């Protein structure tokens, strides 16, 4: 399941974030790569321990945890804190699958979901599409600055070469309360239906029944 979430940050907020990020020191992006991915990866990143990275990462996580669509789709349990990358001058990241486990200062994170928050407007660079292969085929993603795409970490994906301009983004992984992607999809569809019926003032009894089904399935499938 691939979910696009528009306008996580406004254009003005993105400009402020970019001003801070662009002023930092960018380094070789292979610091977060596995052995196989490192042979396919050519980009730049900010140091994960940079205080600006840590502060903006906290801001991004807080914004996502307050976003109903993100919470409904991801059922987040734990983040691997956001990192930031930049592509320019033909830089690319060939097809790969993200590492299953990431280590943080608080322990280990199973990467159930990956997310990219775009911080460059799509008309300011050529190439740089996030191409994801999933059960529904191949999808090419290039969103407006401030928008985010969420997708299963099991997906084969790549960033195509940036042939002109500059593509800056935040990327992150998270562990969901529900490990299985199919179960998460069913819960998301059920939750979205409940929200739509609530907005249409559907009869309370039916809403109570559906809400009960949702929470009982979440109780059965969640791992905390």
Curated annotation (Swiss-Prot):
It is an enzyme of class 1 (oxidoreductase). Its EC number is 1.14.11.-. InterPro entries: Oxoglu/Fe-dep_dioxygenase_dom, PKHD_C, PKHD_hydroxylase, Pro_4_hyd_alph, Pro_4_hyd_alph_FE2OG_OXY. It comes from Shewanella sp. (strain MR-7). Keywords: Dioxygenase, Iron, Metal-binding, Oxidoreductase, Vitamin C. This is PKHD-type hydroxylase Shewmr7_0698. GO terms for biological process: DNA damage response; intracellular iron ion homeostasis. 2-oxoglutarate binds at residue 167. It comes from the Bacteria. One of its GO terms (molecular function) is 2-oxoglutarate-dependent dioxygenase activity. SMART domains: P4Hc. The keyword Ribonucleoprotein does not apply.
